[in-house]
Amino acid sequence: MNTKIINKLKEETNNSSYIVYREKYINNIKIDIIYNEVLTDQDKMSNFIYRSLDHIEKIYQEKELLYDVIKNNISNIKIKEINNYQDICKYLNNGFVILLIEDDYSLALEVKKNLTRSIEKPMTETTIRGAMDSFTENIETNIGLIKRRLKTNKLWNEDMELGKYTKNKISILTIKGLTDSKIKDNIINKLNSLEIDGVTDAGTLKHLIENETKTIFPTSITTERPDKVVSSLLRGKTVIIIDNCPFVLIMPVDINDFFLSQDDKDSNYINNSLTRILRYLAFSITVLTPGIYIALTTFNQEMIPLELLTSFASQRSNVPFPAFFEALLMFISFEILRESDYRIPNVSNSALSIVGALILGEAAVNAGIVSPIMIIIVAITAISALVIVEPELSNAIKWYRILFMLGGTTIGIFGIFIVFIIFTTNLCSINSYGKAFTMPFTPIDSDIKNSIIKFPLLKRNKRNKYLTNNIIREVSYEKN
């Protein structure tokens, strides 16, 4: 039987040089040892596996079952029982050593090599006073970072494998009593129904299970911060962790989630309220400003003060393009510059961004391709987009920015209003895993008190009821 298994393995792996086959005899009982040398720790193999087998050879008595003796005498190593050939392949490709014992008994012993990096500072979601740890590519480490913060038995996780070839481990985390079970069950059903060659990152999985495929707005959040995940779980959200991916999915979400930062928890509620208002203002500026400028200079000049209109006209006197193409050219140039900024090493990207923007803007004005006021409009729009906490929302709204520009260049301010109606209608029609994307703004709900305006912590003593049925007090105190 063992010979058939080994021959089948050699055939399927094309007799790979990385798969090592060894034999060991204990009182004339043959043990076949199989492992993948690129995934297993050779020190553990020497110190635990081979040394333990040598010790077992000395103490073994024939009346005992060798299978049980091995399980009882190899310590400090996770041991799994193997029931079929598929288990052998799974454990072999996960850094386990396979022991094929006569009489059809088989064991898998975990001796995997540590191929992951250590816990580091967050790279994409920096905070001033937040936690300084981030997720890694190891799912056990990531779950540990969460459980270290949530010391409760009510933190439940359900594991599954996804991908015909990658067989990635996926863990779905919820807090019993807080999370809406319908959302969790819906996600699990979608994951179970997926038939795909492999999933290697959170972005791919997000698009596979999203309900809203006809909107450019994200209906889930990707994060690398354990503290952000814990805050979301305490609010009744569901979290998906993927092995070999340092980012975690949070769902469902509402539009307000894209304007919240972990630094908000450390700020005074008055200061933080002003900051949140500033973020929403920046959101409005980055979406509307180019379109309004184009509408005013193209169709509705009477709405501009005379001195300002004269200044605009003198600046644009040598520009051969309409305001729409002028703005579009600058935004395309900015997007190209930003994309190149992402693709080059960190030591060079800041210099390239600054020098590129200065040279490009000055050269464009001197050449008469764009006006100085357009450079200012594009700069304000781009800087305002950076204020938005979640970059996924910034990427989504740039398409609506172009629509507002088209509306402004065709029928002026009236076109801006038409696109605005389309924009708000689209937002109100989106749902994130069964929850309204625009809650608590539409419909208006009492939970709005922790959206744009942040109330004192003791006034925010209930959870969002559109996320969970358990709205018991989160924080309270008794006055003496």
Feature locations, PLM:
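Short aromatic-rich membrane-water interface segments that cap or initiate transmembrane helices
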Residues: 272, 311-322
